[in-house]
């Protein structure tokens, strides 16, 4: 399965194992070096922000607003398993865990109910460890190398929430 990195304005993002916790909203160790979020979920968050009256109906949600430092096109939680590798032209990342809802997420979106909506929707994104350091640029196409496929991101997300 192939996927594409999402919109990014600026130079290529450098990724290395020493970057543990480069996510702006969810710091962590080496297993959380990169937080990736599916672009497909952005319309949902734009709609619920408008419903919560923290944004206008036509107000776009800027890329990176969900705390991610990598936006994925054509790939979401249903297709990510712990240990899968995302192979890009210049680096390799390994799926490590789902993001759990936290107050920082609600603050980033401008309304506290966002935390519950993440839990309910399962639109959590995923953290990645760096296997081979390198850089990522907008529009790069990558592929998934399947891992053991024992635990999916959505299933682990639900289990950690006790659902």
Outline where the language-model segments fall.
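Loop/turn positions that initiate beta-strands
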Residues: 83, 133, 137-140
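Solvent-exposed, well-ordered amphipathic alpha-helical segments
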Residues: 118-119, 143-145
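A structural signal for small-residue-enriched, beta-sheet-centric alpha/beta enzyme cores
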Residues: 123-124, 140-142
């Amino acid at each position: 399965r192939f996927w594409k990195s999402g919109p990014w304005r600026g130079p290529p993002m450098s990724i290395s194992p020493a970057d543990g916790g480069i996510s702006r909203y969810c710091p962590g160790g080496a297993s959380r070096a990169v937080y990736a979020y599916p672009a497909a979920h952005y319309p949902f968050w734009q709609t619920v922000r408008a419903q919560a009256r923290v944004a206008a109906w036509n107000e776009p949600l800027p890329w990176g607003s969900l705390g991610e430092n990598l936006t994925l096109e054509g790939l979401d939680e249903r297709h990510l398993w712990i240990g899968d590798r995302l192979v890009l032209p210049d680096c390799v990342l390994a799926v490590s865990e789902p993001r759990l809802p936290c107050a920082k997420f609600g603050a980033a979106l401008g309304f506290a109910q966002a935390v519950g909506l993440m839990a309910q929707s399962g639109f959590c994104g995923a953290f990645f460890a760096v296997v081979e350091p390198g850089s990522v640029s907008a529009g790069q196409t990558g592929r998934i190398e399947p891992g053991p496929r024992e635990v999916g991101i959505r299933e682990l997300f639900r289990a950690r929430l006790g659902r």
